[in-house]
Amino acid sequence: MNPVRKRRLFIVLAILAGVGAAVALALSALQQNINLFYTPSQIAAGEAPEGARIRAGGLVEKGSLQRDATSLAATFRVTDGVATVTVRYQGILPDLFREGQGIVALGRVDAGGMLQADEVLAKHDENYMPPEVSQALEKSGMLKHYENGKPGGAQ
């Protein structure tokens, strides 16, 4: 092989190796930031991987909120109308967090099936519901019940 071809081959191989390394790094970074959404039914059925960071959403069950008097810890139940999962959160709950409202919690499922949340997101007005929560409630038939019971909903 003549020197010019050898040099071109080396350059092409170096470029391919660089592109391959860049793609591998990008995929690795994206994989670490993926938070899959699970409904309470899926978590209760054991579909959510234990210890993996997930998003879970549904309606906060009325009467389920318990706050620790000595810390910022809060425990509450989230339902999709079919199943319920207990969520434990250490921190200040959002101002719009209420029982009977839709939320999305980010965290990890422990061995007991409880979601240990490190972030809780509440809907930002009475008409908005996160798309994942809305779809989960629609599948379970609870969306109409929620809309009929909320302020401004059909009575």
From Swiss-Prot:
Heme binds at residues 124, 128. InterPro entries: CcmE, CcmE-like_sf, NA-bd_OB-fold. It is a single-pass type II membrane protein. Its main location: membrane. Keywords: Cell inner membrane, Cell membrane, Cytochrome c-type biogenesis, Heme, Iron, Membrane, Metal-binding, Signal-anchor, Transmembrane, Transmembrane helix. Pfam families: CcmE. GO terms for cellular component: plasma membrane. Residues 30-155 are periplasmic. Belongs to the CcmE/CycJ family. This is Cytochrome c-type biogenesis protein CcmE. It comes from Azotobacter vinelandii (strain DJ / ATCC BAA-1303). The lineage of its organism: Bacteria, Pseudomonadati, Pseudomonadota, Gammaproteobacteria, Pseudomonadales.
